[in-house]
Structures are given as C-alpha cells and as structure tokens.
Design a protein with these regions (language model features):
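Non-catalytic structural scaffold of enzyme domains
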Residues: 1-230
Length: 230
C-alpha cells in the first residue's frame, strides 16, 4: 500500500469545489506514478468533489468513500443522519447516493467543521469535544438512529459521540470503503492471499506531531515518512 496524505494543505472541508478537484488531481497524479492496481480516495470531501475528475484521468479503477458509506446507510431502515465537513454536506453527495439506492430515504445532514480539528489535536475524549459533538448531534431529529460518519477523522471521536448520543448506530465510511476495496480487488482478479505487504507513507509536509497523529489513526507504527513535492 502506498499512502499519500496531503498534510500541507488539509483540511479540505472548507475549500471550494474547484480547489478540492485540483488538489485531488494533483495527489492522484503522484500515486499514478506507482502504477497502482486501484486508487482509493480515502477522504469524504475529496470523494464528494474530485472522484469523477480523478476517474477520468486514471487508467486504473478509482474508488471513493461516499458510495460505500451510502450503500451501508441505504440498507438500514428509517431516517439516516450524515455528519460531514461543510464541503461534503454542501455537495449533497451522500443524499444523492443514498436516494439512488432508496428513493424514499429521509436524510438529515449536519456540517461539523470543528470535529476534524479536535480529532487532529488528539482531543478524543475531552469534555469540550463531547460538548461540541452534542451541539452538532442535537441538530438531528430524535428519529434518526443510524448516522454516517462522513469524514474519516470522525471514528476517532466515537467515545465522545457515543456519550453525546447514546444508542446510535454509527456507519464508519472508512471501514465500509475498505470492505469495498477488498471486494473490487477480488472482482478484477488482483486480490492476493499472501501475507500483508509493506506500507509506504508519503506526506506533503511532515513533523513529529503528524507521525503521532497518524499512528493514532492507524493503530500501529508508520515507520519512515517520506515528504513529496506537489
């Protein structure tokens, strides 16, 4: 696996459609240099705005995280909640993808611009984080029992989210996207049964703090980080 994190220019969530598309194409071009079997846009905001452009520019399949998350949400009964960045929510990508599968779906979307920063700072179970989560979640109808975590940072905040809204079933867009990646690799004959391969981590900006945060996300050491220029 070759992972590229655009750490010099995140967060994408408050940027314009045109900027997000440009950033997605630039980072995708670097990854295409490794001749990958599959490209995954492991960011909801970049998936919402840049997926089609990167698919058009790439010879290999390109998968985002919106469609797998929407498929999981559409399979569940009742109203669906979606938490995401401002750019993801404003794109309407989740609403469109869920209603493509379940036309009568009732969807409540909430932009949560503060959550990415709290996750990146490591304030995962801080009282302030819980209060912010509760402020956002209170915007959802009480009838909503299933909520899509429409940003790959948000699962880190599950302890605070669960305390803020007990009894909610959370749909982790990253987890269901990983399952979709495995399924796609099998379908195109590229899924290997061998032992786990190496992980190569590329960043557009690096610091010791970024390594700490990255290892919190992954749950294991990242090893040597490589800095690339766009």
């Amino acid at each position: 696996i070759v992972y590229l994190g655009d750490t010099a220019r995140v967060p994408y969530g408050a940027k314009s459609h045109e900027t997000i598309v440009r950033y997605t194409l630039q980072t995708g071009a670097i990854l295409r240099g490794f001749d990958p079997k599959l490209l995954v846009i492991a960011c909801n905001t970049a998936s919402a705005h840049g997926l089609q452009a990167l698919q058009a520019a790439s010879a290999c399949p390109v998968l985002g995280v919106i469609e797998p998350g929407a498929e999981a949400a559409a399979a569940l009964p009742g109203p669906v909640g979606v938490l995401g960045t401002l750019a993801t929510v404003q794109s309407g990508a989740y609403e469109a993808a869920i209603r493509h599968r379940r036309p009568d779906a009732i969807i409540h979307s909430v932009a949560c611009p503060l959550l990415v920063g709290l996750a990146a700072e490591g304030w995962l179970e801080d009282p302030i984080t819980e209060a912010v989560c509760r402020r956002y979640l209170n915007q959802l109808s009480f009838e909503v029992k299933h909520v899509v975590l429409g940003c790959t940072h948000y699962p880190l905040l599950l302890p605070s989210l669960n305390r803020a809204r007990p009894g909610t079933a959370w749909i982790d867009s990253g987890t269901v996207a990983a399952q979709a990646v495995e399924s796609m690799l099998r379908s195109i004959g590229f899924r290997t049964e061998s032992a786990r391969g190496p992980l190569r981590v590329l960043l557009t900006d690096a610091s010791s703090r970024l390594q700490t945060v990255g290892e919190t996300f992954l749950g294991e050491p990242l090893g040597r980080l490589e800095v690339v220029e766009l």
